[in-house]
Each structure stands twice: as C-alpha cells, then as structure tokens.
Amino acid sequence: MSEAESCEETSKEHRIWKKNVPYLYDTVVTKEVEWPSLSVQWMPDVTKTENSDSSMHRMIHGTHTCGGVQNHLMISKFTITTDTPEFDDAKWDSEREEFGGYGEGSAAKWDTEIKINHPGEVHRARYMPHNPFIIASRGPSDDVYIFDYTKHPSEPKDTKFRPQLRLKGHEGEGYGMSWSNTREGHLLTAGDDGMICHWDINANQTISGQIVPQSKFKGHSSNAEDVSFHALHNFVFGSVGDDRKLNLWDLRQSKPQLTAVGHTAEVNCITFNPFSEYILATGSVDKTVALWDMRNMRKKMYTLKHHNDEIFQVSFSPHYETVLASSGSDDRVIVWDISKIQDPSSSSAASSDSVPPEVIFIHAGHTGKVADFSWNPNRPWTICSSDEFNALQVWEVSNSLVSSEKWETEMI
C-alpha cells in the first residue's frame, strides 16, 4: 500500500469512527495542541466545581517541538461533566455524516495551568505518588529532572531552566521511569545505555542540586526501554529492553533474579497488576502483549493479539483487576479484559481474523501513533491519550458497554 493509499485508508477509518462515537462513548474531547506530546498522565486530585454536574481534573503532559522552539513540561486542568450525555439528533452533521461535539458541553474545558521550561522534548513525565507536586521528567539528555511545580509560575518569565534537582547517572537518553508506590522518593529510570538507575530524591545532594544513583543495574545488552516498580512490594521491580528480555530484580541484589524471553522482537513496556502480586504484562515491537505469572516465568501465561503494529505502552486499570489497555503505532488504544480469555484449544475460541473475546473496547480516535495514555484514577473508564499528530484526547467508554454486575461488584 502506497503512502497516499495508507493516508486515505486512515481518513476513511476515522470518518467511520466519528459516525459511531455516540454509541461507543459517554465523553470524547479532542484537544489539538501546538506540539505533539510524548507523555501524558492524569494526576490523582479531583475537584467538584460549583456546578455539581462537573469535576475538574489535572494532567501532566509535555511538548516535542522543532526548529529551536522552547519545550515545556505542562500541567493542564480538564473539566468534565459527571452526567451521561443524552443522544442528540441535533448534533448530526448531514454534510459530513457524523456527530459533532459529543460530550463536549459547556462543562468540558481544557486549560493550561502551568508551563515549565524543559531542555528538549519531554520523553516521559510522572508524578511522585506520595507527593503529586513532585514530578520527574526525561528528555534527550543523560539527566533526569525533578520539579516541584508549586515553585514555578504559571508562565516562565524567561528561557532559563530551573529544575529542583538533577539526577546524574545515565550515559544516554531514555524513556523508562517508575516511582515506588511503597517507598517515598524512590525512583527507577531506564536508558539507552542499557542501565537501570535507582534514585532516592531525599538522599544527600550536592550544593548545585545534583544527586547520584543509590545503585545501578546492568541486565540488558542493548537499550533498556522501560522499568517498573512492583505495585505491592518494596524491593521488586522489572525491566525490559531491545534484547527482548524481561528481567525481574530485587533492589538488594546486583543481578536479575529471573530472566525471560517471551517476545520475538524488542520489548518496549512493562506494567505490574496493582491488585495481584504475581501478574504483570509486557508490550513489544512484535505487536503483542504478553501476560506473565511470576510464579512460573518459564513461559508466558498468555499472549494478547489484536494490534497491527508495535506496542509502546501497556497499563493495568487502577480500578479493575482483570482490565488493562495497550497502545502503539497502529493508532489504537485497545482495552482488554483477561477474565474473558478462552482456552486456545476450545472450539469457541476466536479465530485469527476475528476480534478476540478479551478485547472489550478499541479506541480508534487517533490518526497517528499513540505515544502514551493514562487511566483516570477517579473515573473508572476514562482515559487520556496522546498521538504524534498533536492530538490529546479524553474519552470515556459508554456505560452501556461496560455496565454489568461484575464491574459494580468489583467497585464495592
């Protein structure tokens, strides 16, 4: 398929998606930003507005500029209605054959609250769970940066870069980053130098605000693409890399405690289940998500297949134990329910050309590679996702598609 044919096919698919928006979502809001964002994360706070039907949420994102334009780490606030919107025939655009502005009532507002100068594009930015005012970021340099965003004005007064801390220990750029949920101030980063660095931002620092790693781990023969603390254990973490390896580590040991190779190409991302101490998932260039059980790492527990291109992000839902999502170069975010996985030997299992039963939703609102996404911690089926064509999207799966006794029971 030529590039022109590919663009036409993408455009056609997007038009079809737009026509079906009212049936698939309770909310879809697209923000066309000036520059693409490689990173996005909801923050944990939520504020009820004066209008009781709305709530205000914050998110972290960044810029990827070109031509010498200043990059920024950004905090934005998003106001979203709490009521399920009604299907409105008046929103049908007969000329374009689509519904417009669905879920974008007067309560849906998106405003930039804080902009912080950043040296180069923001590869990844994540807040510290124990103090969400503290944000770590990565860019195209060796260093990792720590910001307290309460110490920065809403707009920078000049072009000077003013992080609260610089973490110095890598010898190359990177994307992987993970804060500990159980130990305040502890951070892991992965880099193209193949190293994993463990930091304690509360440790002694130099006069110039620099910190060196508490420890460094070498377990990959090429780029270390991602790293993640275990959600429930103090010292357990995992890393993945271009050598196709999944390594499981103990912070107190210098070597991986377990190593597995379950993908046929580079592994880009890793996530631990926040409800189960044994289950984790990895996403790969081979277009699959692998599920793993730490009690038996000799083989994958299951392979999730429905992406058409490499996967860049995977994340378990913070609300439901069996739900996770993944995104990548096929412009899609796929939501999976692993409790729906069928026995591969069963005659009722999905064929290779059908949608597997574990796929419960496909978000097709993007027209370019989905660089990152984030589950909203306060709204169970709401996700923010970003793509390479300057779109940030907030979308909420229709309650009619996911409402069931199972989900209601899990939320009690």
UniProtKB/Swiss-Prot annotation:
Main location: nucleus
Inactivation phenotype: RNAi-mediated knockdown results in delayed cell cycle progression.
GO molecular function annotations of the record: histone binding
Tagged with keyword Lipid biosynthesis: no
One Gene Ontology biological process: regulation of DNA-templated transcription
Annotated PROSITE patterns: WD_REPEATS_1, WD_REPEATS_2, WD_REPEATS_REGION
CC terms in the record's Gene Ontology section: ESC/E(Z) complex; nucleus; NuRD complex
Ranges: WD repeats: 117-157, 169-209, 219-259, 262-302, 306-346, 365-405
InterPro entries linked: G-protein_beta_WD-40_rep (IPR020472), Histone-bd_RBBP4-like_N (IPR022052), WD40/YVTN_repeat-like_dom_sf (IPR015943), WD40_repeat_CS (IPR019775), WD40_repeat_dom_sf (IPR036322), WD40_rpt (IPR001680), WD_repeat_RBAP46/RBAP48/MSI1 (IPR050459)
Keyword annotations of the record: Chromatin regulator, Developmental protein, Nucleus, Repeat, Repressor, Transcription, Transcription regulation, WD repeat
Subcellular localization(s) per the UniProt record: Nucleus
Similarity field: Belongs to the WD repeat RBAP46/RBAP48/MSI1 family.
Quaternary structure note: Binds directly to helix 1 of the histone fold of histone H4, a region that is not accessible when H4 is in chromatin. Interacts with zft-11; the interaction is required to suppress the activation of non-neuronal genes in neurons.
Purpose: Core histone-binding subunit that may target chromatin assembly factors, chromatin remodeling factors and histone deacetylases to their histone substrates in a manner that is regulated by nucleosomal DNA. Plays a role in regulating cell cycle progression. Required to repress the induction of vulval development by Ras signaling. In association with the zinc finger protein ztf-11, negatively regulates the expression of non-neuronal genes during neurogenesis.
Protein name per its UniProtKB record: Probable histone-binding protein rba-1
Organism field: Caenorhabditis elegans
